Amino acid sequence: MITNDKFQFVIHRDNFLSESQCIKLIKYFESKESKDSELAGTYDKNLLNKEVRNTRELVIDEEKLTNKLKMVFELANISTYNYDIKEMEEVKLLKYTQGGRYKWHTDCGAKEISTRKLSAIVQLSDENSYEGGDLEFGITNETGESNYTTTRIRGSIIIFPAFLSHRITPITNGIRYSLITWMNGDTWK
């Protein structure tokens, strides 16, 4: 029997981006016009639901960053997941202000997000520049901890299967910036 005991692991890697790279991305976000984030993969007609997801987003197209993200996805997939992955979606910068949050959700589902396999989140903000805004997973990790909170270290990347339930807790003070993207593949088999 073929097994993959690591199929739901969450990978953390510090220093994916330097402090100066994070600051540069935050400045880029603030220099452009962002939009309210919508819900994806739903049949709900109300795609702007700030009770569920309250954040601003901006698509960024930067070749060096995209290539670096693809490489880390591929390495994580080879070492841990062994999923059938093919292409990366666009990269988005996110800004959570006071009251900003994203309730429990998964990154794969119906329609346009049905082939997402892996998710990545890069922490751009300094960990002490905001309160709340924790990335939490609603699973038990390899040490038996459930609903655990991931790292807030600036420049760190978190990679995880798109089907894992997770959330961003409400921001109570300050601003949280992050970068997100996903790796897609053929239909789950």
Regions found by a protein language model. Give the residues of each.
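Catalytic core of non-heme Fe(II) oxygenases with the double-stranded beta-helix
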Residues: 70, 74-189
